[in-house]
Regions:
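A generic structural signal for alpha->beta connector loops
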Residues: 16, 53-55, 75-77, 102, ...
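Catalytic core of membrane glycerolipid acyltransferases/transacylases, capturing the structured
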Residues: 22-85, 141, 150
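Short alpha-helix boundary/capping motifs
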Residues: 1-2, 38-39, 63, 116-117
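Non-catalytic C-terminal accessory region of glycerolipid acyltransferases
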Residues: 3, 7, 11-14, 24, ...
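Short secondary-structure junctions
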Residues: 17-21
Length: 185
C-alpha cells in the first residue's frame, strides 16, 4: 500500500493537484466523483485515493480491460462493464458490497463525460440497496483540488437526496465546463 500511496502523492504533485478533507472511516461506500467531463477525472481520483491510502473500484467499459494495458487498468480497480448488452449493473454492484467487507466504489453521477440532461441514478440505487453511505469527491480544476466535503446516508427519497448531492458540486469547475450540467431529477 505504501508504494501505491507514494505513486498517488507523486502523481498529484507532478500535476499540481492536492487533496482536501479526511477519508471517512466507513469500510464500504459509494463515492460520487465529479464533475466528470474528461478521462483525466478518473486518473486524478485514482491518484487522490492512493494518497489517502484507499484502494477503490470503479466501473469502466469492458474494452478498457482488454489488450496490452488491460491488466494495468484492472489493477487500478476497474470493474469491466459490457455496455453492448443490458446488464443488471446495480444488482451486481449491490452483490459486490454483500460479498466484500471493504469496498469503495467510485461512480460519476453523470454516468458519462458528455453533457447530460439529468444525472444517472445508479449510484444512488447501489448505495440504497447495499445499505452504504455516499461520499462526495469533488474534482475542481480551477483550484486543482480533489476534496471530500461530506458523506450522506441516503434517505430513500431520491429527489431530496439528489438536491443535496448536487449542491456539493455546484461551485466546482470541470475540465470541460460546457459538459458539466447540474440538473434536476
Amino acid at each position: 500500500m505504501e508504494i501505491w500511496h507514494w505513486f498517488g502523492t507523486a502523481f498529484l504533485a507532478l500535476g499540481g493537484w492536492k487533496i482536501a478533507g479526511d477519508w471517512p472511516d466507513d469500510r464500504q461506500m459509494v463515492v460520487t466523483a465529479g464533475p466528470h467531463t474528461s478521462n483525466w477525472d478518473g486518473i486524478w481520483m485514482i491518484a487522490a485515493a492512493a494518497k489517502w491510502r484507499i484502494r477503490l473500484r470503479y466501473m469502466g467499459k469492458k474494452s478498457l480491460t482488454e489488450g496490452p494495458l488491460g491488466g494495468i487498468v484492472r489493477w487500478t480497480g476497474c470493474v469491466p462493464i459490457d455496455r453492448t448488452k443490458s446488464n443488471d449493473v446495480v444488482g451486481a454492484m449491490q452483490a459486490a458490497f454483500a460479498a466484500e467487507a471493504d469496498l469503495v466504489l467510485v461512480v460519476p453521477p453523470e454516468g458519462t463525460r458528455d453533457a447530460v440532461k439529468k444525472w444517472k441514478s445508479g449510484f444512488y440505487h447501489i448505495a440504497v440497496g447495499a445499505g452504504v453511505p455516499i461520499t462526495f469527491a469533488v474534482m475542481d480544476y480551477r483550484t486543482r483540488t480533489v476534496s471530500l466535503p461530506a458523506t450522506l446516508w441516503p434517505s430513500g427519497d431520491y429527489a431530496a437526496d439528489l438536491a443535496i448531492v448536487q449542491g456539493f458540486y455546484a461551485g466546482a469547475t470541470a475540465k470541460f465546463p460546457e459538459n458539466f450540467v447540474l440538473t434536476g431529477e
